[in-house]
Amino acid sequence: MFPHRREGQRATCSCVARYTPPMYTAAEHAPRALAAAGLDADSLAARPDLAIAEIAGRDSAAAAVAAVRERGFTTLLPTSVATGTEYGDEDAPARTALHLAELLGEGVEVLPSLRLGSPRLWAALNGRFASVIAQRFRISSPCLACHLYLHLARVPLSLALGGVPIVAGERESHGGHLKLSQISQGIDACVRVLARAGVELLEPIRRTRDAEEIAALVGPGWEGGAPELCCVHSANYAGLDGATAFDELAYARYVHGFLEPAGAAVVEAWREVSEPDYEALVRAVLEGPDAA
């Protein structure tokens, strides 16, 4: 039973502070996000060495630094993407972007950070058909297609800027530990999906195994254990011992039968309309021959 509250009596809450959902701009309407940050798509597209940086935690900052060193980017547009499953420090991505600017110095301009999101796209890829996917492929985790979503949500922005590269910070191994969302086959599938849109997905640290190498990229100024946005689904695929064990054949079938074709369907639909019926697109993939 809820305690009775008399008229005029203020309600109390045990939470430290009221939760406010993070604000974002619809990923499908990239020019709006740019305008809200005081940026102009045409002038940015004219810059020859521009890249979009995926911003999350330390690995994403390390990836951005590595990409600048390897490809010579002189302008980075930091972006974060809302998933609806996050909790914690809402300012963490923006703070990471600021630290990135300090790391790179005056030779690289780090633009104001953008926050994007597409709840309907996330729901279609991860939520609506979760039981169907689990039964069909014998593997299921919201993390699998969430990483595809994180990349896809930046595609309209990239295209608005002339198809500039997107830099991501995924790693195939984290000190010998695997993350189901960052398996080699899945990363390759995401690269191919974005390539269909004419966008290069760069993964400069995907084969960086050791934390010491990441630390060398981000420098001593990075605070160890600094607050970051967390996900309610974190490590949902891990066993009681914390290890990631999965059926590699089932995973390969999932990538071939769902992950890549679903991503491709979204990319192709965007050629015709900015906000397609994502649920219908994913349903069609699951009803198609490749998902059998």
Give each language-model segment a name.
Residues F2-R6, R10-A292:
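Nucleotide-activated chemistry modules centered on ATP-dependent adenylation/adenylyltransferase
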